[in-house]
């Protein structure tokens, strides 16, 4: 069997190597923003260029490049595309049944103001879903709901991507932080605590920024009390839970606290001027729907919350472990020609020796978020009284609408894994470590690049965690700070990740318009990560005592 040892400076000059490694990303940017290509075309060109660079510059065997491409494409299909298919199917069932109109009226009974609706659904409810399931599902569900409530598709998708910034670090029950902590050998609570301190200000800022994007400073002034309640309750709960409970629950706790606090506050206060993004006059005629009908209308999303809570319980997860009752539903397919035949080298491994890693495609039929959402959709068919023939028609319609987004997601993940397994992405990160004292400014950018490439804060943390730690040790910086910078920088890259862009466009019916959405979010993402670099530098050199020490 062939072995491949990753080379991080193939051209003998780290900056020249980094320039070559940057070419596929630049091509993706240009394809979307300048040439205005569809998402799948931009992704195909980027993965093709990365494959050529992997073979010709990084000397990766062609067969390994092919296997990396296939592994990434399959991972894009399952579990990621499956999550989005199930989420959109659930939403469409609600619309098909007619009960979504009742749900819409009940939401509008809380407030008719679109600015506050985006905070309640995109920020609060989206954060809860991110804290529980992650993987792009929150963006798909919340963006689709906002379109149903009257916001434009591009607006809904872009605002939900920005709203998703605050909870990503603690997404999927804290896996981004706990996985990195395990990989680098530091207590997860320390990274969680530092992340909570930094994200306190991000979480305070994001809701106000969303309102600003919708209606400028006038909008902030008109909605300040409600937005402040949402932002402060979220940031406060996130800070306390991340510092005292660990990384698993802050995403869920902060979202629920903020959602309840804001909804209760709106019982007693409403903005004097009701803002509608569609320009229509705000009007609401109270319907005489029986309370039971309102409960039925909300039932798909209530059941979704309950099933998600069940899915993350330890006793339920134990059913899928070896010899568990449902272990038969887990399938494993090892890619023999790359599994344990690709070797990472220092500084991406702590030892002085190269280290290989397994490459196994995990096809979990039941123990995956997409299946949990699909199960909710099946239950909702009964509750909403949707006929089987209608449900099958809706599912077929969903698959038809998703065919290009599925292709885009698959190609994006192929690009990610070709870049990761060849060493291309590692070259970019390694170049930034050569900035010496300015490394604190570029440290969040490494996490940002990682999430742009992989679409996942967890993957970015696993990919670059050791590099952040070892560079901090070499430069005598607090390693908890650079590890946190990787996590937080990653959250700021989520809004422009090709995977996230494809998911958001699919959810709101903008497949093929990925360039428009990318153009909407990229400028804010770049500004935010630059500001975060300044914040990390200020902490490192002015107030390092706020960083938890490893004991």
Predicted regions: what they are:
Residues 2, 169-279, 488-551:
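Juxtamembrane and boundary regions of transmembrane helices in multi-pass small-molecule transporters
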Residues 20-29, 37-59, 81-87, 227, ...:
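Hydrophobic mid-bilayer segments of alpha-helices in multi-pass membrane transport proteins
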Residues 95-100, 112-113, 146-155, 182-189, ...:
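Juxtamembrane helix-boundary/capping and inter-helix hinge elements in multi-pass membrane proteins
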Residues 115-127, 153-166, 187-207, 410-411, ...:
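Alpha-helical transmembrane segments of multi-pass membrane proteins
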Residues 137-145, 161, 174-185, 430, ...:
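Re-entrant/interfacial helical elements at transmembrane boundaries that shape
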Residues 281, 288-446, 450:
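Transmembrane helical segments that form the transport core of multi-pass membrane transport proteins
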């Amino acid at each position: 069997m062939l072995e491949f040892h990753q080379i991080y400076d193939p051209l003998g000059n780290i900056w020249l190597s980094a320039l070559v490694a940057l070419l596929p990303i630049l091509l993706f940017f240009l394809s979307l923003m300048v040439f205005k290509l569809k998402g799948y075309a931009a992704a195909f060109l980027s993965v093709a260029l990365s494959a050529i660079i992997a073979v010709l510059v990084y000397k990766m065997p062609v067969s390994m490049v092919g296997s990396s491409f296939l592994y990434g494409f399959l991972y894009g299909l399952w579990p990621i595309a499956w999550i989005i298919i199930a989420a959109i199917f659930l939403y469409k069932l609600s619309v098909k049944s007619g009960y979504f109109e009742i749900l819409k009226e009940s939401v509008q009974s809380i407030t008719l103001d679109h600015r506050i609706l985006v905070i309640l659904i995109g920020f609060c409810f989206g954060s809860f879903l991110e804290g529980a399931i992650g993987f792009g599902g929150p963006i798909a569900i919340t963006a689709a709901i906002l379109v149903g409530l009257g916001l434009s598709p591009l607006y809904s998708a872009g605002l939900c991507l920005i709203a998703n910034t605050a909870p990503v670090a603690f997404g999927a029950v804290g896996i981004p932080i706990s996985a990195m902590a395990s990989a680098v050998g530091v207590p997860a609570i320390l990274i969680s605590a530092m992340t909570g301190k930094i994200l306190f200000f991000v979480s305070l800022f994001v809701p106000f920024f969303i309102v600003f994007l919708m209606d400028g400073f006038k909008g902030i002034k008109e909605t300040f009390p409600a937005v402040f309640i949402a932002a402060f309750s979220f940031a406060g709960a996130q800070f306390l839970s991340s510092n005292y409970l660990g990384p698993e629950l802050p995403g869920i706790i902060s979202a629920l606290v903020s959602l309840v606090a804001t909804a209760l506050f709106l019982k007693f206060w409403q903005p004097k001027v009701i803002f509608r993004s569609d320009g229509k006059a705000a009007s609401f005629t109270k319907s005489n729907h029986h309370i039971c009908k309102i409960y039925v209308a909300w039932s798909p999303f209530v059941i979704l919350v309950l099933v998600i809570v069940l899915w993350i319980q330890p006793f339920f997860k134990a059913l899928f472990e070896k010899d568990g009752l449902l272990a038969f539903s887990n399938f494993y397919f090892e890619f023999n020609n790359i599994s344990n035949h690709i070797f990472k080298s220092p500084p991406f491994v702590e030892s002085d020796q190269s280290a290989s890693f397994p490459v196994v495609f995990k096809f979990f039929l039941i123990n995956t978020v997409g299946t949990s959402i699909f199960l909710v959709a099946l239950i909702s068919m009964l509750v909403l009284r949707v006929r089987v023939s209608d449900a099958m028609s809706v599912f077929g319609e969903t698959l038809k609408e998703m065919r290009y987004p599925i292709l885009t997601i698959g190609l994006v993940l192929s690009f990610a894994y070709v870049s990761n397994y060849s060493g291309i992405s590692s070259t970019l990160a390694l170049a930034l470590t050569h900035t010496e004292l300015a490394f604190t400014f570029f440290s969040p950018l490494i996490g940002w690049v990682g999430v742009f490439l992989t679409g996942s804060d967890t993957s970015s943390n696993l990919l670059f965690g050791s590099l952040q730690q070892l560079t901090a040790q070499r430069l005598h910086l607090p390693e908890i700070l650079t590890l946190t910078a990787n996590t937080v920088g990653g959250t700021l890259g989520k809004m422009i990740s090709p995977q996230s862009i494809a998911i958001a466009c699919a959810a709101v019916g903008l497949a093929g318009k990925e360039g428009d959405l990318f153009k909407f979010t990229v400028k804010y993402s770049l500004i935010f990560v630059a500001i975060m670099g300044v914040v990390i530098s200020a902490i490192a050199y002015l107030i390092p005592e706020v960083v938890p020490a490893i004991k």
